[in-house]
Amino acid sequence: MAKQPTRARKRVRKQVADGVAHIHASFNNTIVTITDRQGNALSWATAGGSGFRGSRKSTPFAAQVAAERCGEMAKEYGVKNLEVMVKGPGPGRESTIRALNAAGFRITNIVDATPIPHNGCRPPKKRRV
């Protein structure tokens, strides 16, 4: 006897009003992740995944494009207010925040959560160009 096809229900997107934008800005790339208050990821984008390769990945414009892409995906969840947490010394720190603001999000507060060692690991040797 033929098995009746089971109907796959359309997955309902949860609606989240407040979110947290985690920005990891390294010297080589910028990663933008938007989560809910509990830390569950809603959307993410990187400068490398946005079509920039090599040294163009580490530009403020690449970080801006990544933030815009991440913001578009987060808007599908109904995110309106963002708390921004920035980590790292990279060139995409400020442009990412500006792009999220221009995308229509209300930024409630900005936190610099860059990890600072209490004299932990030895840093890389200085470059000789």
UniProtKB/Swiss-Prot annotation:
Q: What does this protein do?
A: Located on the platform of the 30S subunit, it bridges several disparate RNA helices of the 16S rRNA. Forms part of the Shine-Dalgarno cleft in the 70S ribosome.
Q: Name one GO cellular component term.
A: ribonucleoprotein complex
Q: Which NCBIfam families match?
A: PRK05309.1, uS11_bact
- Signal sequence, start to end: none
Q: Which Pfam families match?
A: Ribosomal_S11
Which top-level group of life is the source organism from? Bacteria
The subunit structure is: Part of the 30S ribosomal subunit. Interacts with proteins S7 and S18. Binds to IF-3.
Q: Per the UniProt entry, what are the Gene Ontology biological process annotations, in alphabetical order? A: translation
UniProt keyword DNA damage present: no
Q: What is this protein called?
A: Small ribosomal subunit protein uS11
GO MF, any single term: rRNA binding
Report the record's disulfide bonds. none
Species name for this entry? Photobacterium profundum (strain SS9)
Which UniProt keywords are given for this protein, alphabetically ordered? Ribonucleoprotein, Ribosomal protein, RNA-binding, rRNA-binding
Q: Which gene encodes it?
A: rpsK
Q: Which InterPro entries match?
A: Ribosomal_uS11, Ribosomal_uS11_bac-type, Ribosomal_uS11_CS, Ribosomal_uS11_sf
Task: Say which family it is in.
Answer: Belongs to the universal ribosomal protein uS11 family.
